[in-house]
Amino acid sequence: MSSTEKRLLKEYRAVKKELTEKRSPIHDTGIVDLHPLEDGLFRWSAVIRGPDQSPFEDALWKLEIDIPTNYPLDPPKIKFVVFGEEKIRQLQRKTSSGARKVCYKMPHPNVNFKTGEICLDILQQKWSPAWTLQSALVAIVVLLANPEPLSPLNIDMANLLKCDDTTAYKDLVHYYIAKYSAYESNDV
């Protein structure tokens, strides 16, 4: 087992333990789920909840995580799972008892609306081996509440904040959450 696999296994055990404990601090971070996919430790799936007192509050988003072989020296590639409108309509037609409803578009200045790519310095040049997958997800949740409109991937959302039109920004976020939420897909 490589040092990367050992590190990922250690992180997984820690997160799994915290997620099963009812009073664990992880529940306050916005992380709902984080686990490796069945094909090994180098592809993970996560679900986060939007931060309290933000336009994203109480909505859920799914993320996909690709781990490089030299992790933690290099950062993971984390992006929001986004689907096209047809796929979302198919998911919206499904009803599933017990399944989570997640939003498959992320209307945020620092997230590419079509690809789910995230512009966050700790996922690029400011990455340090001290970061974990869990702490990277917490940073993403914090970014949702504290967008950086000066380094946008979604110019339309950034312009609303640059113009100080927070009402339109919040309304647009709520619109997208309502329009693009569906029962969770197991595709990713």
UniProtKB/Swiss-Prot annotation:
A GO molecular function assigned to this protein is: ubiquitin-protein transferase activity
Please name the PROSITE patterns in this protein's record.
UBC_1, UBC_2
Q: Where, by residue number, is the active site? A: 119 (glycyl thioester intermediate)
InterPro entries hit by this protein: Ub_conjugating_enzyme, UBQ-conjugat_E2_core, UBQ-conjugating_AS, UBQ-conjugating_enzyme/RWD
Q: Which Pfam families match?
A: UQ_con (PF00179)
What pathway annotation does it carry? Protein modification; protein ubiquitination
- UniProt catalytic activity: S-ubiquitinyl-[E1 ubiquitin-activating enzyme]-L-cysteine + [E2 ubiquitin-conjugating enzyme]-L-cysteine = [E1 ubiquitin-activating enzyme]-L-cysteine + S-ubiquitinyl-[E2 ubiquitin-conjugating enzyme]-L-cysteine
Query: What GO biological process terms are annotated to this protein in UniProt?
Result: peroxisome organization; protein ubiquitination
Q: Does the keyword Acyltransferase apply?
A: no
Database matches in SUPFAM superfamilies? UBC-like
Keywords, A to Z, come to: ATP-binding, Nucleotide-binding, Peroxisome biogenesis, Transferase, Ubl conjugation pathway
* Highest taxon listed in the record's lineage: Eukaryota
Per its UniProt entry, what is the enzyme's top EC class, as one word?
Answer: transferase
Domain (UBC core): residue spans on this chain = 3-182
Q: What is this enzyme's EC?
A: 2.3.2.23
Q: What does this protein do?
A: Catalyzes the covalent attachment of ubiquitin to other proteins. Essential for peroxisome biogenesis. Required for UBC4-independent ubiquitination of PEX5.
What family is this? Belongs to the ubiquitin-conjugating enzyme family.
Protein name per Swiss-Prot or TrEMBL: Ubiquitin-conjugating enzyme E2-21 kDa
Which organism is the protein's source?
Pichia angusta (Yeast)
